[in-house]
């Protein structure tokens, strides 16, 4: 059967063992890690198989027959005999639930294999829903106890109805297997996988803790910088009343300058009227003096207007600077609150990590 073309009916992961063909007593593990074990339907031969691939070779390629029996020898270990392959397979699962699921699926596949055999004998064809036709589980074969109730093994019959000699040979092979040793080996490999996962999780936690500590230092430095900035801005805000007094004095100076400008404008206008109005016996020297006074007043007036505009500009800049300082203080305070909250979260995370570390 080509597993690349067929989809598995059911798949799980387990540590795979085979009975030692030389001693018929010890179990040989297929590897240090759990392998994928799947049920497949071979449509070409109209049979069901249990397949497990390790690397580039098939570790398990067992055809399920109606006479096979899957026996649970512990809470996490089960086994079955394959007379065609002349071996016994053992599976060590990570949990009792996985073992129960595999055993239930074994019963369903065995029933489907029985239906497939009956249909083949009747000349019919097995449809793709043969597995779903299994409505009842076939009771397991009687158990044979050789060393007490804790070491129950099963009696498996060949699909081709082997004789008493074959059955006795299988019974002897199974009875001589060290069930306790297999259970311990399965538990050992399961613990190895668990330890590897825990070690990886611990390394990730340590890396995360280091990263959190670095982030904590960065946050602390940034928070300290923000505290200094807030202190500077608060000092600037505290100095605002003094600046406010200066601004009031500036405003008064502006008002005085405006009054002086208006007065000078009036004087200029009066002088212009005098210079252009009808006069008796005008004197050239007096007229020139008057014109010079007018020019001086106009020059002074222009200077006053320029000073007024400069002072108004300074006043607006001072007001804008004050508003910017207030806004910057508000933003810095908000950012400081956020950083303090993040620091609190980092401390809580480090505390939880320290409690969880062994």
Swiss-Prot record:
- The segment annotated Required for interaction with NFATC2 runs over 1-80
Query: Where is the segment annotated Disordered?
Result: 137-168, 239-296
Residue spans making up a coiled coil are 95-122, 190-355
Keyword flag Translocase: no
Which cellular component terms (GO) are annotated to the entry?
basal part of cell; cytoplasm; cytosol; dendrite; glutamatergic synapse; plasma membrane; postsynaptic density
What does the comment on domains in this protein's record state? The WH1 domain interacts with the PPXXF motif in GRM1, GRM5, RYR1, RYR2, ITPR1, SHANK 1 and SHANK3.
Q: Which protein family is it in?
A: Belongs to the Homer family.
UniProt superkingdom: Eukaryota
Origin organism is Rattus norvegicus (Rat)
Q: Where is the WH1 domain?
A: 1-113
GO biological process terms, semicolon-separated = G protein-coupled glutamate receptor signaling pathway; negative regulation of calcineurin-NFAT signaling cascade; negative regulation of interleukin-2 production; regulation of store-operated calcium entry
GO MF terms listed in the record are: G protein-coupled glutamate receptor binding; identical protein binding; protein domain specific binding
Sorted alphabetically, which SUPFAM superfamilies does this protein's record hold? Answer: PH domain-like
On assembly, the entry states: Tetramer. Encodes coiled-coil structures that mediate homo- and heteromultimerization. Interacts with NFATC2; interaction is calcium independent; interaction competes with PPP3CA for NFATC2 binding; interaction is reduced by AKT activation. Interacts with NFATC1 and NFATC4. Interacts with SHANK1; forms a high-order complex at least composed of SHANK1 and HOMER3; the complex formation is regulated by CAMK2A-mediated phosphorylation.
Where's it found, cell-wise?
Cytoplasm; Postsynaptic density; Synapse
Query: What protein is this chain from?
Result: Homer protein homolog 3
Gene3D superfamilies assigned: 1.20.5.1700, Pleckstrin-homology domain (PH domain)/Phosphotyrosine-binding domain (PTB) (2.30.29.30)
Q: Where in the sequence is Phosphoserine found?
A: 120, 158
Keyword Transport listed: no
């Amino acid at each position: 059967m080509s597993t690349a073309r067929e989809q598995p009916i059911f798949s799980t992961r387990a540590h795979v063992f085979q009975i030692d063909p030389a001693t018929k007593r010890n179990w040989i593990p297929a590897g240090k890690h759990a392998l994928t074990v799947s049920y497949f339907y071979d449509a070409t031969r109209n049979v069901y198989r249990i397949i497990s691939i390790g690397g580039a070779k098939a570790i398990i390629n067992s055809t399920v027959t109606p006479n096979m029996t899957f026996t649970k020898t512990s809470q996490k270990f089960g086994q079955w005999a394959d007379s065609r392959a002349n071996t016994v397979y053992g599976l060590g699962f990570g949990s009792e639930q996985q073992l129960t699921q595999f055993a239930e699926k074994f019963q369903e596949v065995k029933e489907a294999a029985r239906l497939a055999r009956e249909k083949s004998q009747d000349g019919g064809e097995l449809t793709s829903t043969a597995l779903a036709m299994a409505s009842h589980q076939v009771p397991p074969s009687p158990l044979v106890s050789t060393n007490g109730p804790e070491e129950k093994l099963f009696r498996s019959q060949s699909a081709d109805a082997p004789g008493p000699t074959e059955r006795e040979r299988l019974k002897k092979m199974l009875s001589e297997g060290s069930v306790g040793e297999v259970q311990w080996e399965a538990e050992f490999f399961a613990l190895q996988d668990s330890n590897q996962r825990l070690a990886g999780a611990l390394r990730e936690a340590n890396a995360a803790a280091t990263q959190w500590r670095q982030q904590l230092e960065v946050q602390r430095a940034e928070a300290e910088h923000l505290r200094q900035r807030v202190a500077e801005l608060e000092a600037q805000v505290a100095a605002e009343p003094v600046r406010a007094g200066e601004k009031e004095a500036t405003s008064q100076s502006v008002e005085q300058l405006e009054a002086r400008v208006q007065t000078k404008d009036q004087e200029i206008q009066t002088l212009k009227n005098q210079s252009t109005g009808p006069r008796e016996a005008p004197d050239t020297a007096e007229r020139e003096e008057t014109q010079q006074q007018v020019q001086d007043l106009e020059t002074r007036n222009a200077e006053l207007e320029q000073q007024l505009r400069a002072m108004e500009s300074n006043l607006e800049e001072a007001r804008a600077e004050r508003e910017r300082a207030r806004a910057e203080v508000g933003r810095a305070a908000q950012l400081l609150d956020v950083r303090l909250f993040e620091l609190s979260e980092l401390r809580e995370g480090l505390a939880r990590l320290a409690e969880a570390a062994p």
